[in-house]
Amino acid sequence: MTVRFFDTCAKGTEGALRRELAALKLPRVRGDRGGVGFEGELAHGMRACLHARTAMRVLLELGRFPAPDQDALYEGTRALAWEDWLTARTTLAVEASVVSSAITHSGYAALKVKDAVVDRLREKLGERPDVDPKDPDFGIVLHLARGEATVSLDLAGEPLHRRGLRTASTIAPLKETLAAAVLALGGVDPALPFVDPMAGSGTLAIEHALRARRIAPGLSRAFGFQRWPVYRGGPQSEWDRMKEAARAEILPRAPAPIVARDLHPKALAALRANIARAGLEADVTIEEGDARELVPSSPGGFLVTNPPYGERLLAGEGAAARTQDRKIAGFYKGIAEMLLRHSGWTAVVLSGNPALSRAVRLRPEIDHRLWNGPLEVHLLRWRIP
């Protein structure tokens, strides 16, 4: 049975995801705002779960219909063939987002969908499934925008940035899916040396090592679709074959040196724990030191980092805020000087503060706007002369 899928991603990373899904040879890939769609069998969605590095979720579309009011939303949802997917023994939860809709409360919209699903299953099966908001077998996703409802099933279960590899984190860690997008959009070559001078908990270095060794991002975790009744049998055998093929692609070592550096003890502890959990101790070298003191370790390579944005946490425009601004400017000046010492290298930086770009004083060959959660940031790439 051919169905529609929609892979969500961080705003601004749609191009990276589209190229990724096309490289996976998924049928009829089409870009959209906030994600990328494709069509195919359930196995195609499973392949996206296993291999897509930049996708946040993989949604299987069950239906799309006009929903100008709550009654239309209920009836349209109830008309879908839920009994083809769920049984009375499976659990469910509904998540909703509403945009420019007559129904303005997402929780109420989710409740109407839940009512429609359980009423349909009670009618068709004689029993109703239970709701489990914390750990459901089926995650149902409603997107209600401008009077049109799209109802989907979430194949992943937990979001795809949860690779099953991170055990420790630092303040405001970068999500793995966004880190993968930074590497893809920045054109980071796994065959060249890689250094993250402000590695934090190591997300960029770990994602780079996974790419370099061709380790599929979904190999170490479970997915929601594995709990679906339709998974047992054909899809389960196909999934086992997919994972076996993915393991056969793994390289024994990364082809070039990978260095993750940080100054702070808590970050270094998280870095060591996460690299060990990922099984990448032989691939990633951990260094302790100030990023501003880094010197080139080879004639060329990639400096890739996500420096602190220096968001102003203090209210107002008082002396404390101005002092903070001066400290941030001084810090970025030191980072810029470090980058400029790396002649022959390529710097790829995810920056949330224009002070860094001003300090470097080179025109970036890439300046790509994207979003880190609610924050607008820029992916900057410089070739250091």
Locations of the language-model features?
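A short acidic, Gly/Pro-enriched loop at the edge of an enzyme's catalytic core
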Residues: R292-V304
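Nucleotide donor/acceptor-binding cores
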Residues: R89-L92, L192, G301
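Composition- and surface-driven signal marking solvent-exposed, interaction-prone regions
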Residues: L271-N274, D283-G289, G300, G316-K327, ...
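Conserved S-adenosyl-L-methionine
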Residues: L174-V295
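Glycine-rich nucleotide cofactor-binding entry segment
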Residues: D154-G157, T170-A180
